[in-house]
Curated annotation (Swiss-Prot):
Keyword terms, alphabetized: Cytoplasm, Queuosine biosynthesis, S-adenosyl-L-methionine, Transferase
Family the UniProt entry places it in: Belongs to the QueA family.
Known catalytic reactions: 7-aminomethyl-7-carbaguanosine(34) in tRNA + S-adenosyl-L-methionine = epoxyqueuosine(34) in tRNA + adenine + L-methionine + 2 H(+)
Xref: HAMAP family: QueA
First and last residue of the signal peptide: none
Any single Pfam family the record assigns to this protein: Queuosine_synth
Oligomer status and interactors: Monomer.
Name of the protein: S-adenosylmethionine:tRNA ribosyltransferase-isomerase
Keyword Transcription regulation assigned: no
Subcellular location: Cytoplasm
Superkingdom of this protein's organism: Bacteria
UniProt GO molecular function: S-adenosylmethionine:tRNA ribosyltransferase-isomerase activity
Any single Gene Ontology cellular-component annotation: cytoplasm
């Protein structure tokens, strides 16, 4: 499909720079094909879902994945390098998007320096070698540390990777360390938050449980590729970067049981949906999953695992707007987004949310 079909006008002022307080006070637009748009708040979810439905949360935890360092030149001078880690390849290896990526070569040594507070990790620095180069500034870094030692150094030296549309307008600060993390985050490894989950509070989770609405957890480590613009003119020419995830046998069994008993699978965020669809059999059965997925969902895709999707409002021409258009219908979503813009809904990672019901036959 032509990428320009997914374009729309979005005033920059509608891109949220901070979340609302409390988290569940965010606006929620209910979008059900064949029904009028309905406005609510995230805190109203217990009344918008049914007993027996099962919410699926992505419990990945955002790591401080932006590293700044220096590459030594042959003449003794140095060049500043910024690396955004996006996918772990092994105990000592990460794929990263680097700037200036085109000027780096295999074998180059990079020394990542002091931490955010000006202090150093125990060794004073973190060294890495450029092990491979990819496209669009992507490199593979082989670090001199591995495993938990590498994790500790990255946690000490790295910076929180706010999305570009926010980071371009203000720097990350101490408040983001809490705001850009779900209350149920558990498994470290993401470089972007599963942002639909940012709206949930312990109180809301308790009220959902009291209403007979179940919950399940999976893990998909969101990569920096989620921020990349679609440069192709046709969706068939766009390549998704792989992300790693896991659905345990217990989670798969819980979800299959919920559906067998008449409940709906409610994905909290596009990351949960993408992993569920990657793990689903043609008959809708969800199997355990451990590995990488690069699933790219556009209109025409037949959904197998997910009945309802809660997700934030996405940017024009993004793979995420393509996904929601596949789920609820392109014209339905264009109308919903036009309404959201006209009514001043807040967009993107810190913005408001929508509750989408899958269109018949999709």
């Amino acid at each position: 499909m032509r990428v320009d079909l997914f374009d729309f006008d979005l005033p920059e002022a509608l891109i949220a720079l901070r979340p609302v307080e409390p988290r569940d006070a965010a606006r929620l637009l209910r979008v059900a094909p064949g029904h009028p748009l309905a406005e609510a708040r995230v805190r109203d979810l217990p009344a918008l879902l049914r007993p027996g439905d099962c919410l699926v949360f992505n419990d990945t935890r955002v790591i401080p994945a932006r590293l700044r360092g220096l590459r030594a030149r042959p003449d003794g001078s140095s060049v500043r390098v910024e690396a955004m880690l996006h996918r772990r390849e092994g105990p000592d290896c990460w794929r990263a998007f680097a700037r200036p990526g085109k000027r780096l070569r295999e074998g180059d040594r990079i020394r990542f320096g002091s931490g955010r507070d000006g202090s150093a990790c125990d060794l004073g620095h973190l060294d890495a070698t450029v092990a491979a180069r990819g496209e669009e500034g992507e490199i593979t870094l082989a670090f001199d540390l591995a495993g938990a030692f590498l994790d500790e150094a990255v946690a000490r030296l790295g910076e929180l990777p706010l999305p570009p549309y926010i980071a371009g307008r203000r720097p990350a600060d101490a408040r983001d360390a809490a705001d850009y993390q779900t209350v149920y985050a558990r498994e470290p490894g993401a470089v972007a938050a599963p942002t639909a989950g940012l709206h949930f509070t312990p109180d809301l989770l308790a009220r959902l449980g009291a209403a007979g609405i179940g919950e399940a957890r999976l893990t998909l480590h969101v990569g920096a590729g989620t921020f990349l613009p679609v440069k192709a003119q046709d969706t068939e020419a766009h390549r998704m970067h792989a992300e790693t995830g896991e659905i345990t046998p217990g989670t798969a069994a819980r979800l299959n049981r919920a559906r067998a008993e008449g409940g709906r699978i409610v994905a909290v965020g596009t990351t949960s949906l993408r992993l569920l669809e990657s793990a689903a059999e043609p008959d809708g059965t969800i199997r355990p999953f451990a590995g990488a997925t690069d699933i790219f969902i556009t209109p025409g895709y037949r959904f197998r695992a997910v009945d309802v999707l809660m997700t934030n409002f996405h940017l024009p021409r993004s793979t995420l707007f393509m996904l929601v258009s596949a789920f609820a219908g392109l014209e339905t979503m264009r109308a919903a987004y036009a309404h959201a813009v006209a009514q001043g809904y807040r967009f993107y990672s810190y913005g408001d949310a929508s509750l989408l019901f899958r269109a018949e036959g999709r």
